[in-house]
Swiss-Prot record:
Keywords carried by this UniProt record: Cell membrane, Membrane, Oxidoreductase, Transmembrane, Transmembrane helix
Name of the protein this chain belongs to: Probable quinol oxidase subunit 3
Swiss-Prot/TrEMBL catalytic activity: 2 a quinol + O2 = 2 a quinone + 2 H2O
Organism phylogeny: Bacteria, Bacillati, Bacillota, Bacilli, Bacillales
Main location: membrane
Native source organism of the sequence: Staphylococcus aureus (strain NCTC 8325 / PS 47)
Gene3D superfamilies named in the record: Cytochrome c oxidase, subunit III, four-helix bundle (1.20.120.80)
Gene: qoxC
């Protein structure tokens, strides 16, 4: 099957340059999250937990709901991009809205999770491990929130102007950003929660 090089998001030189710029940006993001992961993994073994063990605090059902919401949103985002490339604006809008709703579910549960930890006396200041934990998850959560706002602004623009060769590349870049955040979450789920549920200190 031949690859269609004339999809709506690939029809302008500016759009292609924006994609290249985004990949450079993602490289910096990998460096950021890589540093945060390295810090947390180091502090998992020998860091100060202040007596608040992850084996007692982490709740698998909550984490699974968050994981399902974010990973399924990656699937719905992919469907939205498929319809964007078919130039079916209404279907694209529908699936992007579903994606953003799932993103909001994720953010809502993360806020609930942080509030729950706070009620148990856990915050970034009590120990080195928890400081790295909140910085990593907070940074990821802020990125997800930024992605939601970014996508909403773009969808409003598309609703007003219609889907065209100028805003389609921007939507494609948003989708890449969203998939990147999902990949980061898979690492968080594995390295932070799965290990944390069986090991503290």
């Amino acid at each position: 099957m031949s690859h269609d090089t004339n999809t709506i998001d690939s029809r302008t030189h500016e759009g292609e340059l924006n994609k290249l710029g985004f990949w450079i940006f993602i490289t910096a993001e990998f460096a950021l999250f890589g540093t945060l992961f390295a810090t947390l993994l180091t502090l998992q073994h020998g860091g100060d937990y202040a007596g608040k063990m992850t084996t007692e605090l982490f709740e698998l059902p909550l984490v699974l709901i968050m994981t399902f919401a974010l990973l399924f949103s990656s699937y719905t985002c992919g469907i939205a991009i498929y319809y964007m490339r078919q130039e079916k604006q209404k279907l694209m809008m529908f699936w992007m809205i579903i994606t953003l709703l799932l993103g909001l579910v994720f953010v809502g549960f993360e806020i609930y999770e942080f509030a729950h930890y706070a009620s148990e006396g856990v915050n970034p200041t009590i120990g080195s491990y928890w400081s790295s934990f909140f910085i990593l998850l907070g940074t990821h959560g802020c990125h997800v929130s930024l992605g939601i706002v970014w996508a909403i602004c773009l969808l409003i623009q598309i609703q007003r102007r219609g889907l065209d060769k100028y805003n389609a590349p921007k939507l494609f870049i948003v989708s890449l950003y969203w998939h990147f955040l999902d990949v980061v979450w898979v690492f968080i789920f594995t390295a932070v929660y799965m290990i944390g549920m069986v090991y503290s200190g």
